[in-house]
Amino acid sequence: MKRDDEVTGRLPVQPISQDVLVQKYLKPGEQGADDLFQRVAAALASVEKEELRDTWRERFLANLQAGAIGAGRIMSAAGTGLEATLINCFVQPVGDCIQGQDADGYPGIYEALREAAETMRRGGGVGYDFSRIRPRGAAVRATASLASGPCSYIDVFDRSCSTVESAGARRGAQMGVLRIDHPDVLEFITAKRTPGRWSNFNVSVAVSDAFMQALEADGDWALVHRAQPGGALIAQGAVKEGDRWVYRRLPARALWDTVMRSAYDFAEPGILFTDTINKDNNLRELERIDATNPCGEQPLPPYGCCDLGPVILPRFVRHPFSIGGKAGFDFDAFGAAVAVQVRALDNVLDLSFWPLPQQRAEAMAKRRIGVGFTGLGDALAMLCLRYDEAEGREMAARIARTLRDAAYAASVALAREKGAFPAFDAQSHLAPGTFASRLDPALQAQIREHGLRNSHLVSIAPTGTVSLAFADNASNGIEPAFSWTYRRKKREADGSVSEYQVEDHAWRLYRFLGGDIERLPAYFVSALSMPASAHLAMMEAVQPYVDTAISKTVNVPAEFPYADFKGLYQQAWNAGLKGLATYRPNTIVGSVLDAAPAQAQPEAQAAAVAADPMRAQIESRPKGALNALADKIEYWTSQGRQTLYLVVSFLPLADGRERAVEFFMPVGQNGESQQWVTASMRLLSLAARGGFLERALADMRKVAWDRGPVRLGHYRKADGTLVPQWHDSEVAAIAFAIQNLIARRGNLEEGASPDGASSIEAPAPMAGAKCPECGAHAMIRKDGCDFCTQCGHVGSCG
């Protein structure tokens, strides 16, 4: 049968794929993916016995070439000699104290912050459970004060992430989790309704079975913590029950509605069903899991790690689209690739640099890995199967079962060769109810006899940039394709704008093989063209074969009824899923943007500057009266509507033009910002008379503060519609207003006007983290990965 990789080998490389490969993965001297594979294979083989290294280097290389790749950190850092971790993500414990350790041995808040900063500096993303931190208003006996609560400390962790630059220039993502019974859960749920707050975090609520049962019974729910409340909270009704304090009770349905409203309108929080996670855990007798990595596919104990590597499913489709023969999936080749991948990821644990000794100790004790797959949506289309129909789900389940069985069998073989993981105990590992207890009896017998090399083996992660770079933009992870093609504009470092046609792998392969893309077959079904129930049904089909979790986003249309939306989460819990994230385009947050900073034009030659009256240096303010324009500037901050009056003075030029030479703010205006806005105007006046006004305004547009985005003006999208524009600070917003004011008089340099910001052809943007590429607060979780709905940028966890 004709292999898909033989066909795709003749496909021209997409420019976007080549650029991602070069920018994120290739190292100096590497010319292409094969050079990179050589580097990674040699690194993985280096931890084998010396007499086996050449053999395994060749096998690892062949497996990489066949489509079994590592996660982003492995492909980027393996074999480089950098002290950067090969692990994508970790879970960082956080205790209920400031320094040292709390009563249960968890690191204090600022010790946890230090450890997380070191982890991110080395290239890892971090997940946290903040539930141990005492609530706002709880008593702090050591200082006779009241606690500020976990949300205030999440602000600190968020700002730290903004400051820390990760190894390899990738800023680590973060996941914040809070239990549904924490007294501050309402504040946590609604925190990200403020645009830009916690922009470096995904957030999820840990929901227990007890809460879901209270919800079904329409009962009350207690918000509890073991920390004693302050006097005011006790006066309001907080009472002690056993070893904990009940801070308040409220209807479970009211609390759930707050969660659902935020998810429906603001795309967060996600939901983690932590009781399901812990009951299914092979190591449930040894550990408690309360958090996940930032993308949710790895529920992890304190200091646990994500050692992940997907296998590209379209590479194992034979006769795609039944062209030249009946389409089929090569299960034997896939199983063989999975077996080699288990060894490769097990070697990563020994090869990796570990940011913290606790992380290394945890990894060595349990040797968690996560073999997964990517490109499921594309593979099903190539097999002429619809993602949203029973036949497609049956094929996906068969693929997942093959993955599970091949991975566990390979881990048994590794245990025979290298030894079982130190914490292995057959009785507890195979106890009724664990994931391993559902394996085939013959495989369980082998585990009892020989043990397992790895406590966990399967994880369906998002693939983000590795899918772009190594899989020809195949659909991510378990997801269907989000769209078959779109255009993406990217602002380069020199200020120029590059435009890409981004195409889905299956779509472009179908065209390459002679298919009519104007009349796509019915099995080409995208994420937004199928019902939400189909997304959940696919998770239900695959989850039984995954010993950790699945990172997946359930896409629903903007008009999806709220009642049905809430029902998705109830259905997910009833189905035994371990979590759920949703994506719904909507009008409330669909316009929360932050325009790319205006770019300064390249400096002209000195002689040209001197000859240009708009840029010639003026030693001092011209004497006498100048034409002036006063402008009222209205903008919105987290404190509400704000107003400033600014005056701009213009110098008439001989050619009839006017040059802005003076900016000031009349005295007597209220507000603590007046002094630094006034100072900025004085500096801008000096810049204007020095001939570099445009550059100064562009620099001001980049100024950021820590009080959240500022709304002023509008952004014009590619289709001509206007949406509100957001800025990183008050100064940045005022600079934007000045650019508009000068542009209205026709005196701003060409290309330096606020309209110079690039418009992006993309789906309607949603509120989220700030995109590092276009600047919009539109980074959401799509396909379980960070994705900018404004410009198409794919971020972390890929």
Where are these regions (language model features)?
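Short cysteine-rich clusters marking metal-coordination/redox-active sites
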Residues: 771-774, 788-791
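Conserved, charged catalytic cores of large soluble enzymes
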Residues: 2-57, 142-156, 168-281, 310, ...
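Catalytic alpha/beta core of large soluble enzyme barrels
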Residues: 11, 297-299, 345-350, 433-437, ...
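Short, Gly/Pro- and small/polar-rich lid/capping loops
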Residues: 444-446, 595-645, 759-767
